[in-house]
Amino acid sequence: MKIQLRDIFEPLSANHMAKVDLWFVMSLIAILALGIVMVASASISVSESIHNTPYFFMGRQILYLILGVSFGFMMLQIPTQNLQKWGILLMLLSLVLLVLVLVPGIGKTVNGSRRWINLIVFNLQASEVAKVCMVVYVSGYLVRRAERVRENLIGFALPLFLTSLFLIFLLMEPDFGASVVLIGTVIALLFIGGAPVYQFIAIVIMAVLVMAGLALSESYRVKRLMNFVDPWADPFNDGYQLSQALIAYGRGEWFGLGLGNSVQKLSYLPEAHTDFVFSIWVEEMGLLGGVVLLSLFALMLSRIFKIGHRALMGARPFAGYMCFGFAILILAQVIINVGVNTGFLPTKGLTLPLISYGGSSLIITLGSLFVVARVDIENKLASKGGESEERKRKSDESIDDGEALA
């Protein structure tokens, strides 16, 4: 069967794109702008030492942003019903990527983890693709098998079985942080899709026990747990990264040292422009700056949840579940990243979405957010169409009444 571009894309006009939720767009733009600023500031020292220029990573991040927006506009032209049709294919494709990343010569190893596939322009992190594709697949599954999920244990367990297959490959990389985010998002979607509460509680308990067992199965994870409990017990070795992050918070106090004035980014805090960029942000902009950034995330996520809710109420369940899934993915990563940065959670290799340096995370996250924008546009078009039909129906009724009176 020949597939043409018009079978995949349904371009939107400028008038349609102007209908996207303004608060969602403005909060996203603000977060992206702060992300570029913080990557530029936090990466100065490491950029100088590695590339002999202070703004190498900022330049790369701007390139990733351009690629992400371009990819996002492409996703914006795809009707959500097409994504629903391709859910199984996308899930299988992401599974193939997780397998490929483990193949020597294809997968790229960084800091002891084999998580990336070199695409020349940037390194593709397979787990980022897998998380988004699983949201698309599970959203479609909840529509196709709605009754089974609500009434049948097998219907509830099937997506969890597929997720466990993903987790096996993720843990082989290893990528424990992505595993936690993925299983948490899938469980949350099943609950939103109507899974019985007792099944939901049982699977949450099981997931917690499994993750706890996995956390204790590797010596480096046990060390991270011990450092999380008391980083000051060994502040110059295993507890070094967290203790330096906490020092950054102490320096920042309420109002911060000022943009660009961080001390911890000067080779004291490892991964200052990636996993621990939030610590540098608070050091420079203070606790109030941290609250502002988290408030922007809260605003953006609340609008995504609202868009998803409108889709569900408008009899568009796939689009609604997908929005909820994307929002939960981002929310989980924000909570874990900030929790790690502040010492409330054990150290994991998770970036702060849209803020931390990195191509895969930024490009894939922007792609998912442009899909949310498509859902919002389709919601409004469907609502307008419904209103037109209602007006036409009332007009026809009035004509019929007039003819009856005549």
From Swiss-Prot:
* Keyword flag Electron transport: no
Q: Where in the cell is it found?
A: Cell inner membrane
Keywords assigned: Cell cycle, Cell division, Cell inner membrane, Cell membrane, Cell shape, Cell wall biogenesis/degradation, Glycosyltransferase, Membrane, Peptidoglycan synthesis, Transferase, Transmembrane, Transmembrane helix
Q: Which residues cross the membrane?
A: 22-42, 56-76, 86-106, 116-136, 153-173, 186-206, 280-300, 318-338, 352-372
The set of disulfide-linked cysteines is none
Copy the pathway line from the protein's UniProt record.
Cell wall biogenesis; peptidoglycan biosynthesis
GO biological process entries? cell wall organization; FtsZ-dependent cytokinesis; peptidoglycan biosynthetic process; regulation of cell shape
Name the catalysed reactions: [GlcNAc-(1->4)-Mur2Ac(oyl-L-Ala-gamma-D-Glu-L-Lys-D-Ala-D-Ala)](n)-di-trans,octa-cis-undecaprenyl diphosphate + beta-D-GlcNAc-(1->4)-Mur2Ac(oyl-L-Ala-gamma-D-Glu-L-Lys-D-Ala-D-Ala)-di-trans,octa-cis-undecaprenyl diphosphate = [GlcNAc-(1->4)-Mur2Ac(oyl-L-Ala-gamma-D-Glu-L-Lys-D-Ala-D-Ala)](n+1)-di-trans,octa-cis-undecaprenyl diphosphate + di-trans,octa-cis-undecaprenyl diphosphate + H(+)
Q: Where is the composition biased (Basic and acidic residues)?
A: 383-397
What's the name of the protein? Answer: Probable peptidoglycan glycosyltransferase FtsW
What is the organism field in this record?
Answer: Marinomonas mediterranea (strain ATCC 700492 / JCM 21426 / NBRC 103028 / MMB-1)
